[in-house]
Curated annotation (Swiss-Prot):
Keywords: Amino-acid biosynthesis, Aromatic amino acid biosynthesis, Cytoplasm, Transferase. This is 3-phosphoshikimate 1-carboxyvinyltransferase. Belongs to the EPSP synthase family. Catalyzes the transfer of the enolpyruvyl moiety of phosphoenolpyruvate (PEP) to the 5-hydroxyl of shikimate-3-phosphate (S3P) to produce enolpyruvyl shikimate-3-phosphate and inorganic phosphate. Monomer. Pathway: Metabolic intermediate biosynthesis; chorismate biosynthesis. Its EC number is 2.5.1.19. It comes from the Archaea. It catalyses: 3-phosphoshikimate + phosphoenolpyruvate = 5-O-(1-carboxyvinyl)-3-phosphoshikimate + phosphate.
Length: 429
């Protein structure tokens, strides 16, 4: 458990952790490239390590270091055991598609209790459209998933754009193996598009090209067939999702902090946290590779469309508690499909602290109260809730006890140490 007490002042220089999204994609691409790749500044978090270990089961040789991963990619081989991806939904979804391209046999992918409840049916249906054989062992669209090796026999696949961008990322990374050119056609408006832009960016660095389809009655992506992943040296940038908690702390608390390793021109959708706090009234300074914050600032509630930024919702919920007026979060139905139902969780847990939050079908309405009280909070094994609630606890009267703090190892392994380094009144018990 994490014990958090009111923190009067934070000061210091700290780096955002490496991007989880970029690390996942880079290590998988490098494993599919025949040759040696050097991945600099990878995230040594539990989820990304799950991707690395899974890639080893498919034949890659990976040397894991704190500052660099050395990946010797090769042709895909059939795993000699069940592939257990722990708690990493990204790993499960990307490798479900990729595993169809082993030379022969079957792959079985599974994970922990949480992963075995996360929806997979839209991806399974899409892969079946391509002529591939894959299914849930429980016949309910959840892991364990069985995938048979097979040739892609169709060049068009239709999939919803409003469920999970990870399904589309899986298709993008699988279809280059097809002998023919392919199209991914979206049947609904796209959500979380920045994550797909990250996928396209990483694929490009590893020699695979993805094009966009933007026609009057058709939208999606086009992928050339017979493409080959190529090894490269790749540096992974800092993670704006993780930096959002540092930004929130900076604008809400008496502060003087510099957050390094976040880039002004990043393709990450969650860079929007900077624009959000600016619109709320925080005069933060964004430079080419860092953000400077001298808080606190008086914030005003605003309306925020979270279509492309679902991972920012817990941070926004905390910001809204201390803003004047109402903060409205909308277009967030997909936020319910993360590690937990984050809309319900933020409502239930922050309400324990005295927050005024109304849960809507697609979002939240947060009425600023400017004062929270310490409470005992559940986090439902969700790393983003732990970190967002920590910021709330640093501003609350009394003591806040946060359960499940070990989940931060997924995306921000040294979160507690970094927060302590700038003066946060927190400890693990």
């Amino acid at each position: 458990m994490l014990v958090v007490k009111k923190t009067p002042y934070i000061k210091g220089i700290l780096s955002a952790p490496p991007s989880k999204s970029y690390t996942h994609r880079a290590v998988i691409c490098a494993s599919l490239a025949n040759g040696l790749s050097n991945l600099k500044n990878p995230l040594n978090g539990a989820d990304c390590l799950s991707s690395a270990h899974a890639c080893e089961m498919f034949g890659a040789e990976i040397g894991l270091g704190n500052e660099k991963w050395i990946v010797m990619g090769s042709e895909l081989k059939t795993p000699d055991n069940i592939v257990d991806i722990g708690n990493s939904g990204t790993t499960l979804r990307i490798l479900t598609g990729i595993s169809s391209q082993i030379s022969n046999g079957y792959t079985v992918l599974t994970g922990d209790d949480s992963i075995r409840k996360r929806p997979m049916q839209p991806l399974l249906d899409a892969l079946k459209q391509l002529g591939l054989i894959c299914f849930s062992t429980k016949n309910n669209g959840t892991a364990p998933i069985v995938v048979k090796s097979g040739k892609i026999s169709s060049n068009v696949v239709e999939i919803r754009g409003d469920m999970s961008s990870q399904f589309i990322t899986s298709l993008m990374m699988t279809l280059p193996f097809s002998e023919d050119d392919s199209e991914i056609i979206l049947t609904t408006p796209l959500k979380s598009e920045p994550y797909l832009n990250i996928t396209i960016d990483v694929l490009d660095k590893f020699g695979v090209k993805i094009g966009k389809i933007e026609e009057k009655n058709k939208s999606g992506y086009k992928i050339k067939g017979n493409q080959t992943y190529k090894p490269c040296d790749y540096t992974i940038e800092g993670d704006y999702s993780s930096a959002s908690y540092l930004v929130a702390a900076g604008v809400l608390l008496n502060s003087d902090i510099v957050i390094k390793n976040v880039f002004k021109d990043s393709k990450q959708g969650d860079r929007e946290i900077i624009e959000i706090v600016k619109k709320m009234g925080a005069d933060v300074e964004i430079n080419d590779d860092n953000v400077k914050i001298t808080g606190p600032y008086e914030l005003n509630g605003i309306e925020i469309d979270v279509t492309d930024i679902p991972d920012l919702v817990p941070t926004i919920a905390v910001l809204g508690c201390f803003a004047k007026g109402k903060t409205v979060v909308y277009n967030g139905e997909h936020v319910r499909l993360k590690e937990c139902d984050r809309l319900a969780a933020c409502t239930a847990e922050l309400s324990k602290m005295g927050a005024r939050i109304e849960e809507k079908k697609d979002g939240l309405i947060i009425t600023g109260v400017h004062k929270l009280n310490g409470a005992k909070l559940k986090t439902y094994h969700d790393h983003r809730l732990v970190m967002a609630f920590t910021i709330a606890g640093m501003l609350a009267d009394g003591e806040t006890i946060i359960e499940g703090e070990d989940s931060v190892k997924i995306s921000f392994p040294d979160f507690v140490d970094k927060m302590k380094s700038i003066g946060s009144n927190i400890k693990v018990i």
